[in-house]
Amino acid sequence: MYQKLALISAFLATARAQSACTLQAETHPPLTWQKCSSGGTCTQQTGSVVIDANWRWTHATNSSTNCYDGNTWSSTLCPDNETCAKNCCLDGAAYASTYGVTTSADSLSIGFVTQSAQKNVGARLYLMASDTTYQEFTLLGNEFSFDVDVSQLPCGLNGALYFVSMDADGGVSKYPTNTAGAKYGTGYCDSQCPRDLKFINGQANVEGWEPSSNNANTGIGGHGSCCSEMDIWEANSISEALTPHPCTTVGQEICDGDSCGGTYSGDRYGGTCDPDGCDWNPYRLGNTSFYGPGSSFTLDTTKKLTVVTQFETSGAINRYYVQNGVTFQQPNAELGDYSGNSLDDDYCAAEEAEFGGSSFSDKGGLTQFKKATSGGMVLVMSLWDDYYANMLWLDSTYPTNETSSTPGAVRGSCSTSSGVPAQLESNSPNAKVVYSNIKFGPIGSTGNSSGGNPPGGNPPGTTTTRRPATSTGSSPGPTQTHYGQCGGIGYSGPTVCASGSTCQVLNPYYSQCL
């Protein structure tokens, strides 16, 4: 992910503490999700969401005077990191009226521009296990499924659902001066080592703060916050990408200045994290008709779809989709010597060889990334626009001086003049993304949890399961690879699974070698 959101406000408080204020009550919007077992039985979990601390009103502990206004700090309340943490506190959130965030049962809607006393742009939220703890997921050996509606997201917007290795308590146990914690959305980190965070590790980030030249609400401080990141879904109605980002140190850690690397630093590759990742964007890989708005695309983004991501114990990452009762595997990619549809070591090596760069492998690749997915990761759901690169890295030609003949440069059909945040906020303020029907469990468990129908769709009278062509073997017939499709209504590919796996029915339209 080239940048994780242009942020709005901050957090903290007394006695060098990161504490909470009481002028606005903090009530987390409820959100249910499902935990599934290997037999395909899923049980409802009662959760909630919390907005990130950077969006919150930060004011004096003894008054409503702003500690941070626009993109600058109060020189009186915040002359340095320690004094600022002592003088300022983080307040509660009016989720719907201020931030455009609403929930209903298992559905979360995030609006783009919300106008209340002030203008708010986008949001970043975390799934909660309790009122004071983020929900953690161990991805390795499991699969994660959700429904998403990106129909209202034009070029330049990013409805991102992803995981990061941030602390479940928001950093409270590591940094005792942080008493606000997960209840108020503290402790964020990602592979860009963001420096636009107002406070990190219970300390202010005011020293060295430089207000943004093109964003009236943000700036960059002297510190950043790093950790591993798994981008399950970065998407709008035009393009989508799946991207793991390893770090040499898995969990959250603070960094200094340009040595942070990432989007916010002069030396992009100077930090401990991989800012580029090993991405799987079907359009970038040459399949320009797989994903987009309208019936001419395999996946029609004018309609809701289900996204299922599987994390093999080998470290490989697999993906399939369901829409209108039809299951679609990730389309095959032909990249150098690589041919297949699994994001594995061979694919990532081929991508670096063909598209350039070595950041992913330099930071340990999938072997290092497994250290993150084998531990707890926090679920993040967001909507944002990009003041650094106009989201062209997701949905257009990037860098903009490249052409269609440059391998990997074309990532989507959007114009290189699209995605300008000021224009988006003016022309598409009502844009939104909706995430729903979250399920998590062992590989093969989430697709059969709705009474035998594919997740996210109703079984039509007659359907076919579309999949990319696979190579065929000699008699007695082709063999499907582990985790490949091996059956389903309308399916005509290999039905015999490779040694060590068997063909298991997940729903009438999709069977998989497990």
Swiss-Prot record:
Region Linker: start-end pairs: 454-478
Any GO BP: cellulose catabolic process
InterPro entries reported for this sequence: CBD_sf, Cellulose-bd_dom_fun, ConA-like_dom_sf, Glyco_hydro_7, Glyco_hydro_7_sf
EC class name: hydrolase
Disulfide bonds: 21-89, 36-42, 67-88, 78-84, 155-414, 189-227, 193-226, 247-273, 255-260, 278-348, 486-503, 497-513
Entry-linked SMART domains: fCBD (SM00236)
Catalytic reactions on record: Hydrolysis of (1->4)-beta-D-glucosidic linkages in cellulose and cellotetraose, releasing cellobiose from the non-reducing ends of the chains
Signal peptide: 1-17
Active site: 229 (nucleophile), 234 (proton donor)
Disordered as annotated region, ranges: 401-427, 444-481
Annotated protein name in UniProt: Exoglucanase 1
Species annotation: Hypocrea rufa (Trichoderma viride)
